[in-house]
Amino acid sequence: MDAATLTYDSLRFGEIEDFPETSDPVWILGKQFSALTEKDDILADVTSRLWFTYRKNFQPIGGTGPTSDTGWGCMLRCGQMILGEALICRHLGRDWKWSPGQRQRPEYVSILNAFIDKKDSYYSIHQIAQMGVGEGKSIGQWYGPNTVAQVLKKLAVFDSWSRLAVHVAMDNTVVIEEIKRLCMPWLDFDRGACAVSEEPREMNGDLEGACALAEEETALWKPLVLLIPLRLGLSDINEAYIEPLKQCFMMPQSLGVIGGKPNSAHYFIGFVGDELIYLDPHTTQPAVDPSEDGHFPDDSYHCQHPPCRMHICELDPSIAAGFFCQTEDDFDDWCAQIRKVSNCRGLPMFELVDSQPSHLITADVLNLTPDFSDSDRLERFFDSEDEEFEILSL
């Protein structure tokens, strides 16, 4: 195996290279650290991220399917990690820290239970694999980052606790109006941004309660998970995209990037110098079975060792970048940062526009309902993606 593709399975944890002694700032999901004076803080922050890896001996997918995702599920696990980070930000906050060996907050337990390897967990490997069948992917088949993004968008609809608005940007374009329609569906944008739908909604026959809820909703914003599938080059990443990509990790709304190299997928959470920092799903651990109260040993869901690093030029150009906006102000701030980055050196990775060009308007924009044909358009754009990644056998 090439040294550049060493994984946690092929290295003893004690042999993983520590962070370099460098004056270059370390950026992890919108936070800046010093490798010279804050190494413990860096490792604590990395350890607090959810780490989803291959698992074995879980319930058969679909009742008769695989009981392990080793060799084919790495991109699915990366999708779990980027969404897991969104749920952490949603329910616990970006500054939350994991404390090993201690009883955790109920919100944390609920988040982990959403990813447990069983069929009735919102974002389990079972749900992702079976939902992928609707995207034309058979169970056990490789997923590209755009397919994972589309599947996560579908699954989030059923997560009433988190109440996320998951948006997958199409055609390398982020449309501000489209996102605000999604995150504030109770506003009538056709009559003006401040207009509220006048249709009464019954809640168990209680119109007064419905009105109270409507008043509450007008002050709310459905927390946004924005996933942007991108292609930053042909066979290799275009160096003009390197600085804009780094800037994404510096934004407080950053959820990181899923992607990798031609033979494996990784979850990228930051960078130092010209090296990307990532969590690697390529180690196989036994499936965890929660107790009746929902609690279970959680050590295996946190990487308690220095994360992996790779030179940014080794990144496969097909990626999906993620961002989380808890409030409308967060989203407006993100838009301002993106416009600033677009005016700096390098090529913008995607376009940010106020409204959707008429020739690109889709039923999803008009109806505000999940349009499962979105992935078809993305697959045509990324039609070579799945062939470029190879299944990694360990």
Curated annotation (Swiss-Prot):
Protein family (similarity comment): Belongs to the peptidase C54 family.
Keywords: Autophagy, Cytoplasm, Cytoplasmic vesicle, Endoplasmic reticulum, Hydrolase, Mitochondrion, Protease, Protein transport, Thiol protease, Transport, Ubl conjugation pathway
Record has Transport as a keyword: yes
Any Gene Ontology CC annotation: autophagosome
An annotated GO BP: piecemeal microautophagy of the nucleus
Localization in the cell: Cytoplasm; Cytoplasm, Cytosol; Cytoplasmic vesicle, Autophagosome; Endoplasmic reticulum
Motif placement: LIR: 389-392
Gene giving rise to this polypeptide: atg4b
Active site: 74, 280, 282
The organism of origin for this protein: Danio rerio
Protein name in UniProt: Cysteine protease ATG4B
InterPro entries associated with the record: ATG4_LIR, Papain-like_cys_pep_sf, Peptidase_C54, Peptidase_C54_cat
Enzyme Commission number(s): 3.4.22.-
Broadest EC class assigned to this enzyme: hydrolase
